[in-house]
């Protein structure tokens, strides 16, 4: 049973990396800096309820942020989100 549990954990980790890694690569500038406006929404690790905005590539969309963790594509207002992420 220990081997089966280990293999399941390795498989789960592999799938998570395959899903997450391309999203992080696509958010990277040519000079290696990450463009936070291209990161996916991330509600974080806690269970609190903060209504925030993230830039979805076109507009700023509401989402629930848990209060800890997540990424920097998170803004308190639509105005702040558009100011940082909207391309003129």
Swiss-Prot record:
Summary of the tissues where the protein is detected: Expressed by the venom gland.
GO cellular component: extracellular region
Family note: Belongs to the venom Kunitz-type family. 03 (sub-Kunitz) subfamily.
GO biological process: envenomation resulting in negative regulation of voltage-gated potassium channel activity in another organism
Protein name stated in the entry: Kunitz-type U15-theraphotoxin-Hhn1i
Propeptide: 28-33
Matching SUPFAM superfamilies: BPTI-like
Disulfide bonds: 37-85, 60-81
PROSITE patterns: BPTI_KUNITZ_2
Residue ranges annotated for the BPTI/Kunitz inhibitor domain, each copy included: 37-85
Summary of the function given for this chain in its UniProt record: Serine protease inhibitor that inhibits trypsin at a molar ratio of 1:1.
InterPro entries linked: Kunitz_BPTI (IPR002223), Kunitz_BPTI_sf (IPR036880), Serpin_venom_toxin (IPR051388)
PANTHER family (UniProt xref): EPPIN, WAP FOUR-DISULFIDE CORE DOMAIN PROTEIN 6A
Compartment(s) where it occurs, according to its Swiss-Prot or TrEMBL record: Secreted
């Amino acid at each position: 049973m220990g081997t089966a549990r280990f293999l399941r954990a390795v498989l789960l980790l592999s799938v998570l990396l395959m899903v997450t890694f391309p999203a992080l690569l696509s958010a990277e500038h040519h000079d290696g800096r990450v463009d936070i406006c291209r990161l996916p929404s991330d509600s974080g690790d806690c269970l609190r309820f903060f209504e925030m905005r993230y830039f979805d590539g076109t507009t700023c969309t509401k989402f629930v942020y848990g209060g800890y963790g997540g990424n920097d594509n998170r803004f308190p207002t639509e105005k702040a989100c558009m100011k940082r992420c909207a391309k003129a």
